[in-house]
Amino acid sequence: MSSSIDIGISQDQRQQIADGLGRLLADTWVLYGKTHGFHWNVTGPMFNSLHGMFDTQYNELWDSLDEIAERIRALGMPAPFGDST
């Protein structure tokens, strides 16, 4: 009995998709960090609206990080983290 389900995508194709998702995961991680930094450091007359906007954005990015990593795992590949890429 096979431990994986045949979804009609070859191993090579799954690897290519996972590699692309891995790059998306890395880019999203960078954007998450930068957005969080802006949230912490925003000043000025638009502080309240920008602070709230950045809060919403970094929380949504966090959810996206989890979703992207889980999609990589669903393809049967390990989700990259740290120096694993």
Stretches with model-predicted labels:
Residues 2-24:
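Disorder-to-helix initiation segments
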Residues 8-16, 31-56:
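Helix-loop segments that flank and shape redox-cofactor active sites
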Residues 19-22, 26, 52, 59:
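A generic "alpha-helical surface" signal
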Residues 24-40, 68-71:
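Long, well-ordered alpha-helical segments
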Residues 36, 84-85:
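Mobile beta-alpha loop/short-helix "lid" or hinge segments that flank ligand
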Residues 42, 46-84:
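Conserved alpha-helical segments that form or flank metal/cofactor-binding pockets of metalloenzymes
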